[in-house]
UniProtKB/Swiss-Prot annotation:
Domain of life: Bacteria
GO molecular function: 6-phosphofructokinase activity; AMP binding; ATP binding; fructose-6-phosphate binding; identical protein binding; metal ion binding; monosaccharide binding
Protein name: ATP-dependent 6-phosphofructokinase
Biological processes annotated in GO: canonical glycolysis; fructose 1,6-bisphosphate metabolic process; fructose 6-phosphate metabolic process
Stated regulation of activity: Allosterically activated by ADP and other diphosphonucleosides, and allosterically inhibited by phosphoenolpyruvate.
Family: Belongs to the phosphofructokinase type A (PFKA) family. ATP-dependent PFK group I subfamily. Prokaryotic clade 'B1' sub-subfamily.
Cofactor(s) needed by this chain: Mg(2+)
Pathway assignment: Carbohydrate degradation; glycolysis; D-glyceraldehyde 3-phosphate and glycerone phosphate from D-glucose: step 3/4
Provenance organism: Lacticaseibacillus paracasei (strain ATCC 334 / BCRC 17002 / CCUG 31169 / CIP 107868 / KCTC 3260 / NRRL B-441) (Lactobacillus paracasei)
Binding-site list for ATP: 11, 72-73, 102-105
Gene this chain is encoded by: pfkA
Organism lineage string: Bacteria, Bacillati, Bacillota, Bacilli, Lactobacillales
Enzyme Commission (EC) number: 2.7.1.11
Amino acid sequence: MKRIGILTSGGDAPGMNAAVRAVARKAMHEGLEVYGINYGFAGLVAGDIFKMNESTVGDKIQRGGTMLYSARYPQFAQEEGQLRGVEQLNKFGIEALVVIGGDGSYHGALALTRHGFNTIGLPGTIDNDIPYTDFTIGFDTAVNTVVEAVDRLRDTAASHERTFVIEVMGREAGDIALWSGVAGGAEDVIIPEHDFDVKKIASKLQSSRERGQKHAVILLAEGVMHADQFAKELAAHGDFQLRSTVLGHIVRGGAPSARDRVLASQMGSYAVELLLQGKGALAVGIENNKITAHDVRTLFDAKHHAELSLYTLAEELTF
């Protein structure tokens, strides 16, 4: 193996650039040529491919987003799209790839491996919804961004004795809301993985007010419902001064945290090691603070589970 490619796919996440940097520099250290593929699988099919060097990834580790850009390309699920990608890989002499993205990106990685190009997947998503990894690249930064916003919103909530419902990203996973809720001292956390009762929440808020706590912050995962709808349902059970806020794509941006930079560097380096061993169709993760790899096919039938012990802790520490 002499040449490998790197692409980022799906939603961007802080730390993707750190992962690209690690893959590129580790591969170059091992004597490999490295090619960057712009715009994910769409760029692969279009042949938007360029040779990288050490300076290409210089001054990138601290930057959010992805220097390789990203795009969704559902056509790659079809054989025709895959064959067009294979044609471009052959044209540039690329023999293996590292794909950085969410669960959808892993399907593309498996398809390319089946076509004879070993491909390793790295979990790049703020949602932390990938099975067989405790953390995904970008999750820690996203939580820190949310917590900073929660701290700021709590200031104004306290000033006006209001209850803020803060909706955060995460798709069908509640990890961002859960971790941010505990770190931000939220009065309640609503996630898809756990049932909730609006009437009981209203009752707890009222009891808290009677004890002198005149303001509150509630973290709501977007996979449950929209913040406005939740606030409307909550208002039906009590006389609360409610405000709803949506923390949208701001959570995906910004410089990656130190933890995400280190995690991305570890995963990127390990991905190259796996390729040098002739392995493909593997998904890299971190489990119990150890970098691991699993057959990517096992991820499709598995389901990520939120750390419900953390949910219990959140309940014990609120109201």
